């Protein structure tokens, strides 16, 4: 069975519209599908070059355009994404092949490779000196090609392990964020299961409604929930407008107004 996840991801041909917009405090970043696909390709190249397949790539990042890029780039490389803190990782007895985070203390020290990513949306390198043996999760990506041939994997391959599954916060009033279907949220999903959940969430929220606005607000403190909502938006041909955890109600209102989000 072919990989059902890859068709949801942007490709170099998707240059006609923004796929992802990220709002933070005094920050707005817009990425077309073409530009985003280049980031995914570089990340996939980095992942496959710097690590060998293990228990997964630890993406220790909060909701942000970079966490979307690292998760999707990991999937492009045929690997699984691990979400949660180093404590969660240790408790589960897992050994990531790569750990990526915004802060040194959030890295999993036992990972085969580690990379620090600058939290500033437009930064192209880590600000300051890197700890010993830790890679720059922005500058070091620039050495990799803008295109990447997806690593062949199957629909039943695990793609997401959410070790911090504690239930996602409800969507903000006035948004069309796709929520996780009722019931306890699973901590492990195959590629087929993730796509099925995206399809179910999209159907339950009317994400493909032709009268809906071209963009959808994604506001969740939970990275796993944020990733699902982004995929729901993309599957419906809409722009995912992600708010970072620091973005307050004023930023949300500005994003809704500027991006023309209505429903």
Locate predicted features:
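AMP-dependent adenylate-forming
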Residues: 8-31, 147-189
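ANL superfamily AMP-binding
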Residues: 17, 34-59, 76-79, 88-89, ...
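Conserved AMP-binding
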Residues: 61-64, 218-223, 240
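Conserved short alpha-helical elements in the N-terminal third of ANL/AMP-binding
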Residues: 73-77, 224-240
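Conserved ATP-dependent adenylate/AMP-binding module captured primarily in the ANL superfamily
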Residues: 82-110, 122-135, 197-215, 246-263
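Short hydrophobic alpha-helical runs that function as membrane-insertion/retention elements
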Residues: 81-84, 115, 240-243
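Actinobacteria-biased recognition of intrinsically disordered, low-complexity terminal regions
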Residues: 1-17, 27, 49, 206-212, ...
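Preference for solvent-exposed, low-hydrophobicity sequence contexts
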Residues: 114-167, 178, 188, 250-251, ...
């Amino acid at each position: 069975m072919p990989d059902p996840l890859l068709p949801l991801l942007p490709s170099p041909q998707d240059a006609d519209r923004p796929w992802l917009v990220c709002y933070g405090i005094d920050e707005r970043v817009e990425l077309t599908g073409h530009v985003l696909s280049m980031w995914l390709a570089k990340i996939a190249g980095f992942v496959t070059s710097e690590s060998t397949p293990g228990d997964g790539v630890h993406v220790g990042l909060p909701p942000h355009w970079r966490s979307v890029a690292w998760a999707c780039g990991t999937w492009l490389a045929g690997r699984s994404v691990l979400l949660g803190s180093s404590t969660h990782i240790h408790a589960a007895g897992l050994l990531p092949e790569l750990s990526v985070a915004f802060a040194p203390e959030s890295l999993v020290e036992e990972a085969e490779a580690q990379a620090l990513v600058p939290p500033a949306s437009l930064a192209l390198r880590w600000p300051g000196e890197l700890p010993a043996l830790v890679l720059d999760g922005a500058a070091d990506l620039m050495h990799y090609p803008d295109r990447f041939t997806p690593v062949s994997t199957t629909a039943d391959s695990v793609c997401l392990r959410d070790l911090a599954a504690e239930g996602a916060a409800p969507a903000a009033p006035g948004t069309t964020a796709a929520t996780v279907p009722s019931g306890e949220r699973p901590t492990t999903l195959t590629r087929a299961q993730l796509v099925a959940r995206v399809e179910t969430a999209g159907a339950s929220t009317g994400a493909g409604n032709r009268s809906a606005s071209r963009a959808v607000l994604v506001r969740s403190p939970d990275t796993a929930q944020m990733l699902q909502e982004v995929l729901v938006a993309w599957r419906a041909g809409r722009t995912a407008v992600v708010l970072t955890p620091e973005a307050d109600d004023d930023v949300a209102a500005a994003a809704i107004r500027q991006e023309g989000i209505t429903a």
